[in-house]
């Protein structure tokens, strides 16, 4: 039974087949399952682990037991080096090949794996789990074999070198009185299922933290409560009638869409008396990595701080784990469903492979949650983008390859919920005109999927989606032949007393970018209601204005489009793309140089969508220029570092692709709606100096690249500082 086909790991075998196999044959099987090119050091580590374990596991060679290499914990994005399923016990092995000493961070890593299995892995809930750290050159071994004080059947982490691992396993089996041979059936394809314990902790964590602090807190509670109540009613009707339904929630930036999504995720999971409902759970999913990272870290830090103040012995990693019940990155949800399909796809139809998934009575082959909330659903990928991505196995070729994927991401997400055999509801949170990256499909792709593939789904949508930002204003037209559509104004987060600034700012931004004649009037309206918008041509003045505006712990930051190129002369650097960087940029205070408040690193639309600061500087580069009543779009063509050609110098060139032009326009739409309290727009003067020979000193920053845009803003009466 060596290496039965699965997408959950790189290698799986019974002990006997593994021990009798040639080590290089096992390594070859791991290579075959690995997507991408393994590093030499990774190869060497795998080979040493294989050779060690063939000897170490020999006492149990003839038992019914399994070994698994590189196991992916469903939907958590974590991978365990080696799992042993022996006598009903789960051993989590974390190897540090060539390492002599045990590090605290490594101990915490292997313990986290054990906790993740206990809390989220259905077939591990009621099992003994033993985390073992193995720095291979370590010369001593743990001598205490006890379950943790939390009475959860998890052993305290054990530490041993390679030479002591066999004895450690023997001692664990003796202490656990594990005398009967046996593995755990279907453990490798266990469904993702959070325990009631982790869900209750997550609920407490969420309810004791004001999410408005980190999402969009111009939202009006009356307005959002009406929308939340409507969605919960749709969910309840779907449950009672055994139907599949989808709700589209729309609204201006700052109207509270993310807040609505998180509230629905929590409230749907509990009955009116506050008890957890295992069958009615919901999950909030977003493809926005920085948003998920910042939300998760903010909630976790707050919970950790409050727990410590109460004298509780709690780790920050525990709080993060609790948050992950309700808030997850959408790609892991998607990948978990992809792991269940027959591959390659035949005749353009997705099918579940019963060898790769467990069918449950209620959820069928779907995920455990009846309700999935997709934030920023307009950013779901087109068929072309996701098909290309899966064909090459991800960005770097290191993920599951599906060579002929037949549908868009929106269609696949609906298909995933459609696998449930009872009922399901999808909630799509839609930002109009906020598709900002190549291959982001917008609301029209969701509607197309419903019309063409899922006509049996009920569709609930606002009747106000006539603006150009929503499927070019064609929402009603696209749905006119769908017989299952219900229109309701309760699904659009619109004007309210507390969100007037967000609503007015959104109207001004729409007119500004569309050259509507009321833009100047709307600007005055925004400013007169306490939201300052000022203009400058100097980054120093912009920084000074931000520092003067911010009081107490109010946050400032510089924002820039990802296509921008000529910002270094202004002493601005772009924040490197990583979720950790986004967390530090948003959450650290004014004493930390990684904080946005230092006004040194600028975040792009990719990093700030769905989040905001109090006061922002939007640095407007030459990538989008005003020209006689229209926008022109430019991309920066850099020189080839290794093969320079004559006349091949860095320069701006026109962006002619209409799709890319739309993304560039939407990028600025996102950037100038990120500030809660006010913003300064900096349009540089450029460089008008010439060389002694009369040539421009910097031909990439000519004043003409900026002056017309500056003139347009001035014509609207925007106050200059």
Task: Locate the predicted segments by residue.
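C-terminal accessory regions
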Residues: 422-425, 598-721
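Hydrophobic anchor at the beta1->P-loop junction of P-loop NTPases
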Residues: 249
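Conserved lysine of the Walker
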Residues: 257
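N-terminal pre-P-loop "Q-motif" helix
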Residues: 213-245
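Conserved RecA-like ASCE ATPase "motif II neighborhood" in helicase/translocase motors
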Residues: 317-417, 600-604, 667
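Accessory nucleic-acid engagement/destabilization modules that flank
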Residues: 1-194
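Signature of the SF2 helicase/ATPase Hel1-core->accessory helical subdomain module
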Residues: 373-477
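Conserved helicase/translocase motor-coupling segment
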Residues: 261, 436-442, 451, 457-628
């Amino acid at each position: 039974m060596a290496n039965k086909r699965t997408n959950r790991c790189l290698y799986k075998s019974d002990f006997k087949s593994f021990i009798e196999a040639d080590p290089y044959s096992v390594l070859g099987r791991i290579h075959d399952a690995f997507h991408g090119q393994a590093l030499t050091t990774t190869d060497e580590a795998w080979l040493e682990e294989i050779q060690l374990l063939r000897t170490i596991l020999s006492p149990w060679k003839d038992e019914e037991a399994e070994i698994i290499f590189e196991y992916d914990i469903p939907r958590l994005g974590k991978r365990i080096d080696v799992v042993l399923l022996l006598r009903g016990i789960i051993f989590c092995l974390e190897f540090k090949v060539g390492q002599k000493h045990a590090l605290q961070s490594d101990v915490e890593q292997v313990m986290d794996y054990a906790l993740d299995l206990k809390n989220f892995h259905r077939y591990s809930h009621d099992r003994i789990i033993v985390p073992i750290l193995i720095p291979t050159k370590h010369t001593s071994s743990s001598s205490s074999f006890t379950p943790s004080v939390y009475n959860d059947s998890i052993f305290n982490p054990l530490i041993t070198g390679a030479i002591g691992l066999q004895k450690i396993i023997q001692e664990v089996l003796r202490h656990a009185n594990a005398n009967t041979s046996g593995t755990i059936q279907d453990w490798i394809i266990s469904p993702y299922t959070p325990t009631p314990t982790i869900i209750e902790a997550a609920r407490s964590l969420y309810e004791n933290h004001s999410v408005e602090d980190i999402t969009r807190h111009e939202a009006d509670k009356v307005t959002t409560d009406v929308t939340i109540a409507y969605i919960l009613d749709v969910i309840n009707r779907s449950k009672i009638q055994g139907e599949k339904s989808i709700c589209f929630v729309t609204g201006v930036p700052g109207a509270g869409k993310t807040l609505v999504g998180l509230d629905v995720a929590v409230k749907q999971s509990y009955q009116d008396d506050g008890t957890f409902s295992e069958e009615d759970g919901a999950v909030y999913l977003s493809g926005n990595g920085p948003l998920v990272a910042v939300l998760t870290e903010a909630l976790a830090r707050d919970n950790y701080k409050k727990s410590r103040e109460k004298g509780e012995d709690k780790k920050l990693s525990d709080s993060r784990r609790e948050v992950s019940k309700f808030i997850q990155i959408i790609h892991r949800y998607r990948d978990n469903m992809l792991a269940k399909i027959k591959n390659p796809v035949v005749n353009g139809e997705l099918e579940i492979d019963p060898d790769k998934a467990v069918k449950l009575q209620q959820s069928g082959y779907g995920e455990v949650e009846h309700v999935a909330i997709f934030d920023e659903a307009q950013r779901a990928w087109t068929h072309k983008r996701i098909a290309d991505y899966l064909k090459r196995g991800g960005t770097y070729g290191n993920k599951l390859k599906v060579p002929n994927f037949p549908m868009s991401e929106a269609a696949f997400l609906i298909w995933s919920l459609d696998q449930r055999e009872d009922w399901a509801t999808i909630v799509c949170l839609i930002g109009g005109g906020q598709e900002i990256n190549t291959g982001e499909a917008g609301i029209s792709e969701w509607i197309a999927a419903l019309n063409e593939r899922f006509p049996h789904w009920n569709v609930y949508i606002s009747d106000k989606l006539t603006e150009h930002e929503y499927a070019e204003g064609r929402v009603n037209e696209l749905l006119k032949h769908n017989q299952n559509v219900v229109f309701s104004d309760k699904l659009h987060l619109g004007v309210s007393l507390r969100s007037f600034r967000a609503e007015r700012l959104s109207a001004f931004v729409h007119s500004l970018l569309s050259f509507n004649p009321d833009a100047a009037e709307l600007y005055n309206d925004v400013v007169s209601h306490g939201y300052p918008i000022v203009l400058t041509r100097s980054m120093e003045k912009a920084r000074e204005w931000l520092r003067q505006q911010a009081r107490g712990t109010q946050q400032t930051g510089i924002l820039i489009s990802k296509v921008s190129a000529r910002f270094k002369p202004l002493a601005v650097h772009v924040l490197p793309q990583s979720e950790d960087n986004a967390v530090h940029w948003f959450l650290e205070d004014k004493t930390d140089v990684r904080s946005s408040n230092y006004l040194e690193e600028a975040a792009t639309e990719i990093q700030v969508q769905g989040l905001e600061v109090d006061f922002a500087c939007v640095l407007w580069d030459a990538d989008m220029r005003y020209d006689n009543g229209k926008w022109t779009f430019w991309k920066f063509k850099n020189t080839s570092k290794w093969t320079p050609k004559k006349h091949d110098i860095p320069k701006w060139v026109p962006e002619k692709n209409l799709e890319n032009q739309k993304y560039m326009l939407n990028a600025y739409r996102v950037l100038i709606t990120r500030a809660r309290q006010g913003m300064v727009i900096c349009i540089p003067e450029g460089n008008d100096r010439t060389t002694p020979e009369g040539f421009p000193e910097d031909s990439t920053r000519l004043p003409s690249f900026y002056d017309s845009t500056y003139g347009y803003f001035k014509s609207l009466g925007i106050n200059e500082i």
